């Protein structure tokens, strides 16, 4: 099974972001028929660790490792001693990964990002300690909004990045860590396997 761990923003934060994305040039291009591969708002998430393909027989090990990481977080060992509750985040700003055919536009994460990074680190360490696969890339919290590739003029991408730079969504608590199984598409499908409250 193909797995990743994620934090899902609440519906009001996603709706706020969706209203912003609707005003971008890439949304106008999509409405005109250009395949800019807008991300379905119901799938909007922040990936903490990508495990990739894991044997179904190891799913129990994955759950145990993630449960231990969340227990550490709840106990203050990860999210900061004396800081009760989940990290409070907000979506704001934005950027791009890649160029040309591999261009991806994303929204940045603001707020208690250090605590979110500590949780991502704990998740990755717990997976590695259990001998499970996990990201080796540095954690860069973001929410992908589109994969336009080279189907939009450079000027439109730059204009959308400038618009995103001024964006700041409402604050929200990252209330749970979710283990997600992805099934490649089109369209790709996500199935929530297990969730742990933070």
Outline where the language-model segments fall.
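Histidine-dependent nucleotide/RNA phosphoesterase domain, centered on the 2H-phosphoesterase fold
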Residues: 1-198
């Amino acid at each position: 099974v193909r797995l990743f761990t994620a934090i899902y923003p609440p519906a009001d934060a996603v709706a706020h972001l969706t209203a912003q994305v609707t005003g971008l040039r890439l949304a106008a291009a999509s409405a005109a028929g250009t395949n800019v591969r807008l991300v379905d708002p119901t799938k909007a998430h922040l990936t903490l660790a990508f495990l990739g393909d894991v044997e179904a027989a190891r799913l129990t090990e994955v759950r145990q490792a993630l449960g231990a990481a969340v227990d550490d977080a709840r106990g203050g060992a990860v999210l900061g001693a004396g800081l009760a509750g989940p990290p409070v985040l907000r979506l704001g700003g934005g950027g791009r990964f890649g160029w040309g055919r591999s261009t991806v536009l994303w929204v940045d994460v603001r707020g208690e990002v250090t605590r979110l990074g500590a949780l991502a680190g704990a998740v990755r360490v717990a997976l590695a300690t259990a001998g499970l696969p996990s990201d080796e890339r540095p954690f860069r919290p973001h929410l992908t909004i589109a994969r336009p590739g080279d189907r939009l003029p450079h000027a439109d991408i730059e204009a959308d990045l400038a618009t995103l730079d001024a964006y700041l969504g409402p604050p929200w608590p990252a209330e749970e860590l979710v283990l997600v199984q992805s099934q490649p598409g089109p369209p790709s499908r996500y199935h929530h396997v297990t969730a742990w409250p933070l």
